[in-house]
């Protein structure tokens, strides 16, 4: 009778969002056998967060608006994309550098709006003007003219954070400019200082390490490169090692045939963002901001994908630093943690179909408690809060969900 009473008390505590660290392993083991409890405890270990162990600086989370192929974002869609209080909280906008200077001004309204919300704007060129190309290759004799074209664009739109001179130059048969890593390096070495904005490169199709390393072997190009960027089509995020540059993932989408409201697909994206951050990367940029499969749909609604992105973008702001954290402490649970001053933000992806109790330990920071925000198949950025005592606590993660903890 006493054992049953203890079990029932712990059940009540857990499902009330208990943050106590005093639940014993024996009690947890007993709970897992209780016929009315669906909480998962299998292979659960503590997620250890060391806020004193600093990793990469985070630049943000964002998406693309490409006017050559899609109508511009509306005012309402810009707010929903970039507002950290009422929208997704994107802090990066990616745009296309047009081949015609007559189209430069069309980019400016959304660029200005994104900047107004504090977002960084990065611009990628798919092609140089045709007069500067032979087929799908940039003429070496046109390097200076192409740099002047990029610089003119930067001036026309009021300045961007960085420019990529080539989009997926290693994607053979794409229809846009192709170039070897050596060729991209040669252009940046010769003209990277004349493009009007800092250079991001080489932006390969599949974040190809060999391509990136070959590009960076050009010491002059490397010195003129602000940060390395690339896309993860066909590639699982991975750590590029000590390349001496911040790494941005500047384009990807998971499935264009599935609605942005498909919950399983949204959870796939959640894990992908986790993987990018856990690989030491500084930024994650989705493909189209507004698309049926994107974070905002064609009817201007924030989708489930958008709310999943918001679990990162709203709370992990540019300038936050990722800190050491147990990445996969329990079966189906993935954790990253970030710090800004004394504030700690923890993002947890729970892939399990059952409520999962996850314990945490903290060092290097002593919060009094957390605001908890979570998104699952039925809730969007739901909120509650809890206090903690000491350097350890535990919480319930709702089934198939993304949870963000913000210290207070």
Model-derived regions: residue spans:
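Carbohydrate-binding surface patches
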Residues: 328-366, 400
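Noncatalytic carbohydrate-binding groove/subsite architecture in carbohydrate-active enzymes
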Residues: 177-270, 279
């Amino acid at each position: 009778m006493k054992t049953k009473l203890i079990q029932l008390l712990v059940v009540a505590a857990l499902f009330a969002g208990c943050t106590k660290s005093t639940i014993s392993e024996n009690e947890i083991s007993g709970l897992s056998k209780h016929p009315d409890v669906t909480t998962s405890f299998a292979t659960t270990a503590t997620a250890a967060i060391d806020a004193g162990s600093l990793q990469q600086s985070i630049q943000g989370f964002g998406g693309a608006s490409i006017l050559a192929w899609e109508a511009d974002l509306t005012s309402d869609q810009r707010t929903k994309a970039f507002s950290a209080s009422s929208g997704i909280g994107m802090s990066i906008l990616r745009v296309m550098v047009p081949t015609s200077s007559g189209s430069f001004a069309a980019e400016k309204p959304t660029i200005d709006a994104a900047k107004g919300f504090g977002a960084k704007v990065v611009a990628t060129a798919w092609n140089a003007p045709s007069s500067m190309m032979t087929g799908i290759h940039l003429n070496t004799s046109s390097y200076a003219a192409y740099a002047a074209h990029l610089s003119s664009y930067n001036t026309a739109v009021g300045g961007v954070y960085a420019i990529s001179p080539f989009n997926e130059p290693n994607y053979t048969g794409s229809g846009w400019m192709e170039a070897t890593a050596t060729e991209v390096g040669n252009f940046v070495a010769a003209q990277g200082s004349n493009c009007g904005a800092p250079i991001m490169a080489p932006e390969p199709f599949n974040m190809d390490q060999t391509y990136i390393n070959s590009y960076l072997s050009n010491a002059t190009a490397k010195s003129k490169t602000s940060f390395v960027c690339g896309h993860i089509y066909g590639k699982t995020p991975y750590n590029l090692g000590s390349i001496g540059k911040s790494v941005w993932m500047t384009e990807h989408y998971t499935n264009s045939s599935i609605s942005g409201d498909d919950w399983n697909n949204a959870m796939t994206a959640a894990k992908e963002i986790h993987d990018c951050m856990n690989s030491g990367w500084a930024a994650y940029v989705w493909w189209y901001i507004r698309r049926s499969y994107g974070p905002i749909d064609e009817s201007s609604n924030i989708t489930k994908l958008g709310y999943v992105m918001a679990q990162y973008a709203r709370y992990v702001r540019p300038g936050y630093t990722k800190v050491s954290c147990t990445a996969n402490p329990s079966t189906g649970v993935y954790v990253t943690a970030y710090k800004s001053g004394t504030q700690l933000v923890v993002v947890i992806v729970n892939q399990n179909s059952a409520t999962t109790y996850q314990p945490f330990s903290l060092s290097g920071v002593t919060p009094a408690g957390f605001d908890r925000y979570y998104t699952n198949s039925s809730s969007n950025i739901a909120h509650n809060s809890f206090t903690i005592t000491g350097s350890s606590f535990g919480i319930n993660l709702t089934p198939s969900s993304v949870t963000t903890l913000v210290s207070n």
